[in-house]
Amino acid sequence: MTGAETVSPDGLNVHVAHRRNPYAYLLTDDELDALLLELGLKRAAAIWRNHTAGERAPRGAYPRPMMGFVLMDATAGPWIPNDSAVLGVVVIGDRGHEYLPNAAAKAGCHRRLGRNNGEAVHVDPHRLGSGSFRYGHSAEVRGQIVGASSQSPDQDLHEAGQLAADFVAALGERHLAWEHRRGPEDWLSPDNAPAPEYRAMIDWYSGRPS
């Protein structure tokens, strides 16, 4: 695990860490942490703003100046278990880490079922099972799943969706810049070579038919 941390202008601690980096062609580990930290600071600003806005908060005042976020790896195949498919976490506030299990449960359920955790909570509880989390929604933006926790269910959903959207947009911008730097190559890799997985898929083939 690698990570980074800082304090927001409003005084909220922001800590991020990633477990997987499927975008190594695009971002070093330190750069991925820096991106998560940048996006975490945006969420910290929103959390503080909505926590202190009182009746002016568009989705109601946030009850706590803290949150925990879990991002899943959008590139991970369905055969990879949830505990190995976590891309990283974003923790806001002194006790934001206490909400990571809730966020993980939402994100993990969403990945397993292929839909918002809240649907299972409210409509299909037979799909949850022992040890599942009883509250809240998860968000998915163009395949990027995020679970978030510590506010109301709707507030958690909004914040998860914002983080997912920001992450997808940031990766898209960096990917386009990478394409312009590299030109018309075939593979998303520093040496323009396929991943070992794709080589392994055809290792059994010995050559052209005679």
Mark where each language-model region is.
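Structured interaction and signal-relay segments at domain junctions
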Residues: W48-P125
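Sensory/regulatory domains in signal-transduction proteins
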Residues: R115-Q162
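Compositionally biased, low-complexity repeat tracts
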Residues: V7, R56, S84, V89, ...
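Juxtadomain coupling helices with adjacent low-complexity linkers
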Residues: G11-G54, G143-S210
